[in-house]
Amino acid sequence: MLHELLLALLGFTGDLIVDEREQRKTLGLAFNSDSPLSDECTFKLAPDISFIEPSERDLIERLIKLGFYYRELDRFAKKSRNLSWIRSVTSVHPLERADELSKQSREKKPSVYRRAIANGIGEILSVYRSAVLHIEQKLLAETTPILATVTEGLNKFFVLFPPLYEVILEIERDDIRGGQLLNVLNKRCHCGVPELRTCLQRLLWNGHQVMYNQLAAWMVYGILQDPHGEFFIKRQDDGDLDHRSSQEEVSEKLARTSVHETSLTDWHSGFHISLDMLPDYIPMRLGESILFAGKAIRVLRNPSPAFQFQKDKSFQQTMRGSQRIRGFMHSDFPETETELDADLTGGELLPQSEADKIEAMLKDLKESSEFHKRSFECTVDSVRAIAASHLWQLVVVRADLNGHLKALKDYFLLEKGDFFQCFLEESRQLMRLPPRQSTGESDLMVPFQLAATKTIAEEDKYFSRVSLRMPSFGVTVRSSQADMVRSKVSLTGKANLTSDTSVDGWDAIALEYSVDWPMQLFFTQEVLSKYLKVFQYLIRLKRTQMELEKSWASVMHQDHIESAQHRKDGLNGSTSQQRRQGIRPMWRVREHMAFLIRNLQFYIQVDVIESQWKVLQTHIHDSQDFTELVGFHQEYLSALISQSFLDIGSVSRILDSIMKLCLQFCWNIENQESNPNTSELENIAEEFNKKSNSLYTILRSSKLAGSQRAPFLRRFLLRLNFNSFYEATARGVLNVVRQRPALPL
């Protein structure tokens, strides 16, 4: 009976102690170790045994539960470790072995985390087996009560095995893997039994070893070591791939793309955080820091071949950029950065000493017997800071971020006003005609290159990155002159000019900026599209302002010619005086238009662009963190768009209509020689008054007064209404039932 009991404690049943589940099976059919676990103990004393007292029976049945738990825990450990493939390494053909492993993977869903937990369970079961062996030796050597000795020797396992069995039961039932498995163990560690807590913490430690190995691969080498999809960092295309796909298949897919494309894809959308696999005790902020650190290390360890080729060529530019940055960053810039710059320009983007430092920090976490959240957070933050600092060195110093930002400001934000003034003057006559779908872009290239020749210095190395684009049109686009002619009927009929929703075809003028690695990490397509949005707005504003000036100069020049001709011919010029007197109210309208456009332009260029540029420069000089720079730059662009009212539909639509009216007014004014009828000008003036006063009403509306944009709206309104003339005009017009075609003096 002693040996029956000892064997049962090790999971082997016999005649005295039986397994009810096995008895239900057909005789001679082997028991399948992969069958689902039983929810309750199936080890029982044989019912036909009558020589055992009821009290002893109860004690034996209590003891043999340990044998049941041992067997189930042992089966779980063997199944999870699944090392049977080792036996066939030398006896099976490699292709057949690969097929077999693939089949086993599909059937059993391998998990490195389960394997680690199984190793921890194996350690506990080893202690249990030693205890059973010690009991056997003691019973054979001494004459002691059997049941009392066994109970005393295995008493601590009554506390350990039932909770452990509940853990593996939950794991098997819900197919828990990866970070979810760590969650289960971490929650169960919070218990009041010291022995059980120590045991569960050991299992959690085994699971953390796998996580730390994955973190080391990711944060030291930029490699995602996750063959079974259990890490909380995943590839973006993992949703399209079966988690059972081998690492070789993923590598083969990535090999089809170039290193350059892969690097950009990995940075922008290649990886993401899987919330299902992120342990609850790791905050989302830390998960994002781990994600960023790994992506940054990938970038630093895998630079673009073109960038490596240009390394020696850009050495002098690098040092100049580094000195310029230090000059802006005050006198307390660390001296160690000088050595770092030398190392970066001379060789590695991520020095081996830094990689060793990261690896040492992760190794300290790995060797700790318990998981300390504070230590984990400090380590992750330190690694992230190292990665962000070296990425900052790469982008800001080596790739000259400030130079690119200045170039975008020069060309997309019209900082080089002389260039765009020259370009608009050279292309003025061309833009009076409809843009041709086939040659519109090439037509514009002539004045564009001519303006560049006149105004752009040879040392401007960034101009070569700027190119002019004229998108093809999907619909028929009318020119400005055609809009003016076809709108005559509606103007004569006093219809609303804005009912015609077609836009000037030349408003689609676009700039493109060529960005190389690694600046593509900073200047994404989304960022460049925001720059383009502001550029198209500013170039229209610049063109409108120029047309208002040119129309005045053109008509004045024509008037002087006529006056000189009349004096030469000895005529009294009464007809010319009458025409000049009749059109004088229109010049007041033109002045009002120029006043509004000029102040809008001054507000955007000075109050918005220049002020936000200074804020951005301060952030760049004070920060050495790449992610902070990205955030500051996003704030800069958002401020440009928001403070220019491009995201306020009511304001932007009215300003758009006002610019169209200004252009139509200018072309009508210049055509007065051939078409002396002023009714069209009067209708344009009337419509402009309406739009101008609507703009004032919106700027003063209570709806926008409480918004975040209220200070900028008030600043723009202050420029327009610095002497209360704008307000008085608006009130006067709004109180009149029928608007007048001309503004009062």
Swiss-Prot record:
Annotated Gene Ontology cellular component terms: cytoplasm; microtubule; microtubule organizing center; plasmodesma; spindle; spindle pole; tubulin complex
Keyword set includes Cytoplasm: yes
Stated induction or repression of this protein's expression: Up-regulated in galls upon nematode infection.
Source domain of life: Eukaryota
GO terms, biological process: cortical microtubule organization; microtubule nucleation; response to nematode
InterPro entries: Cro/C1-type_HTH, GCP, GCP_C, GCP_C_sf, GCP_N
Keywords, alphabetical: Cytoplasm, Cytoskeleton, Microtubule
Residues that span the membrane, as ranges: none
MF term (GO), any: gamma-tubulin binding
Reported function: Gamma-tubulin complex is necessary for microtubule nucleation at the microtubule organizing centers (MTOCs). Gamma-tubulin complex is essential for the control of microtubular network remodeling in the course of initiation and development of giant-feeding cells, and for the successful reproduction of nematodes (e.g. Meloidogyne spp.) in their plant hosts.
Subunit structure: Gamma-tubulin complex is composed of gamma-tubulin and GCP proteins.
Protein name per its UniProtKB record: Gamma-tubulin complex component 4
UniProt source species: Arabidopsis thaliana (Mouse-ear cress)
Gene this chain is encoded by: GCP4
